[in-house]
Regions:
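N-terminal and secondary-structure boundary signal
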Residues: 2-391
Length: 391
C-alpha cells in the first residue's frame, strides 16, 4: 500500500512539474515589465490633432527605459491604411513635461505625451489610427526591446439605417465611433441610443466591444513567445479555429489553465469518436470559447487576440440603470447567437431568435449596439427598470 501511494504521489508531482515546465513561456523578456498607464483620454475630437498623456512605468526599478519612438498608421472607413498622420512624442519626469526630444536614458518611470497631427480634410475619411510605441530597457539583463499598440478613435458615428422587421421584432443597428480600450462603453451606449428608445425595447451589445473597452487584448507582437505546450496543443485544432495558432492557444491556457485545457482535449477527443461535438469548449469554459484570434475582429483590432469580457453582468446592469431599459451582452456571428449576460426582464431565447441574422455585422460596420423592438410584448417580459431616466 505504501509503495502504491508513493507511486501515485510521485506521478502527481511529476505531472505538476511537467505541466509547469510546459506552460512556461519559452522566452522571458525584461521589457515586458514595462506598462503604459493612460492618464488622460484622447482630446481634440473634431480637429486635425489628437493629444493624450501616458505614464511608462517599470515594475523593476533597476530597469531604465530608453529610445522611445512612435510610429502611426491611419485607417480609412474601408479599414485600409491611409498615410495621412504623423506622430510626435515628448517625455518628462514626474509631472514635469518639457517639450523636448526623447532622452537617451529616461529612468524607470516616464511621463509621455503623444500628439497625432494631420490635415483636417484627411481626418474626415478616417475611423482609427494605431500608434506603436517602442522602447528598450537596460538593466542587469542587458538591452531588451519592448513596446505596445494604442488605438486612437478618429471618425464619428454615422446616422443609423432604418429598422429591419424580422417577424417577432424589428432590429436597428446603432453605429458609434470606434470603441477603444479605456472607453466608458455604458456612456457610449447611452449617448448613441438617446431619443431612439421606447418602453419594452431591448439593447443587445456586442461582447467584442465590451472586451475591447476593458482592454482584454493580447497583441502577439509585444507578448512573450508561446509556451511549448501552446505550440504543441495548437496542432490539435483545424486551421480555422482561434486556437490553431500558438498565440491563440497560449491565450486559452492563460485563461483556463493548462490542466483544464488538457482535460478538455481528452474529453473532446473521446466524445468526438461517438459523434458528440463541442465538448471541448464546454469543459474548457466559455472564456476559451469566446477567444478571437488575430484576424477575427474589426480593424485595427484584427492584429490582436480579443479575449472574453470580464464584467458582462455588471455592465448590463449599468446600462439598464443609465438608460432605464433592458440590456444584454451577446456573442453573435454567422454560426449562431449566445447571450452572455442579460438583465432580469430579457427573454433570452426570444432575443437569440431575433438576432439570428447577426445584425451587428462582422465587418467594418461599427455597430456594436442593436436595438430590438418587439412586434408583440413577451408574456414573460418583466417590468422595465424604473431607475434612471429613459434614454
Amino acid at each position: 500500500m505504501f509503495v502504491l501511494l508513493s507511486g501515485l504521489l510521485a506521478a502527481a508531482a511529476s505531472s505538476l512539474l511537467w505541466g509547469w515546465v510546459l506552460a512556461r513561456p519559452s522566452q522571458t523578456r525584461p521589457g515586458d515589465a514595462v506598462k503604459l498607464i493612460p492618464l488622460t483620454p484622447w482630446s481634440g475630437l473634431g480637429s486635425g490633432r489628437r493629444l493624450s498623456r501616458f505614464r511608462l512605468h517599470s515594475a523593476d526599478p533597476t530597469l531604465s527605459i530608453t529610445g522611445l519612438t512612435a510610429q502611426v498608421e491611419a485607417f480609412g472607413l474601408d479599414a485600409l491604411p491611409r498615410p495621412s498622420l504623423q506622430a510626435s512624442v515628448r517625455v518628462g519626469f514626474g509631472d514635469d513635461l518639457p517639450r523636448q526630444a526623447v532622452r537617451d536614458v529616461l529612468g524607470s518611470e516616464v511621463l509621455v505625451e503623444v500628439e497625432l497631427a494631420g490635415e483636417l480634410l484627411d481626418l474626415k475619411g478616417l475611423h482609427a489610427a494605431t500608434l506603436e510605441l517602442t522602447w528598450q530597457t537596460y538593466g542587469r539583463h542587458g538591452w531588451h526591446p519592448g513596446g505596445t499598440t494604442l488605438v486612437v478613435p478618429l471618425g464619428r458615428a454615422v446616422a443609423p439605417a432604418q429598422p429591419t422587421p424580422l417577424g417577432i421584432a424589428s432590429v436597428l443597428p446603432v453605429p458609434t465611433r470606434l470603441v477603444v480600450p479605456g472607453d466608458d462603453l455604458a456612456a457610449i451606449v447611452a449617448g448613441a441610443i438617446a431619443g431612439r428608445m421606447q418602453p419594452g425595447d431591448c439593447l443587445a451589445i456586442s461582447e467584442s466591444a465590451l472586451a475591447i473597452s476593458e482592454n482584454r487584448l493580447v497583441w502577439p507582437r509585444w507578448t512573450q513567445a508561446p509556451s511549448r505546450a501552446a505550440r504543441a496543443l495548437s496542432r490539435c485544432f483545424p486551421v480555422a479555429s482561434s486556437l490553431a495558432t500558438p498565440h491563440g492557444m497560449q491565450a486559452a491556457i492563460d485563461e483556463a489553465g493548462l490542466p483544464r485545457i488538457l482535460l478538455a482535449l481528452l474529453f473532446g477527443g473521446v466524445t468526438k469518436l461517438v459523434g458528440l461535438r463541442g465538448v471541448f469548449y464546454r469543459v474548457a469554459g466559455w472564456k476559451v470559447a469566446l477567444i478571437d484570434d488575430v484576424g477575427g475582429s474589426l480593424p485595427p483590432f484584427d492584429r490582436a487576440i480579443v479575449l472574453a469580457p470580464r464584467s458582462a453582468p455588471a455592465f448590463v446592469a449599468e446600462v439598464s440603470r443609465r438608460c432605464g431599459t433592458e440590456a444584454a451582452v451577446v456573442d453573435a456571428n454567422a454560426l449562431g447567437v449566445r447571450v452572455l449576460a442579460a438583465t432580469p426582464g430579457v427573454d433570452v431565447a426570444r432575443l437569440e431568435q431575433a438576432l439570428e441574422g447577426n445584425p451587428h455585422g462582422n465587418g467594418i460596420e461599427r455597430t456594436p449596439i442593436v436595438r430590438v423592438r418587439w412586434s408583440q410584448p413577451s408574456p414573460d417580459l418583466s417590468e422595465i427598470a424604473k431607475e434612471g431616466a429613459p434614454c
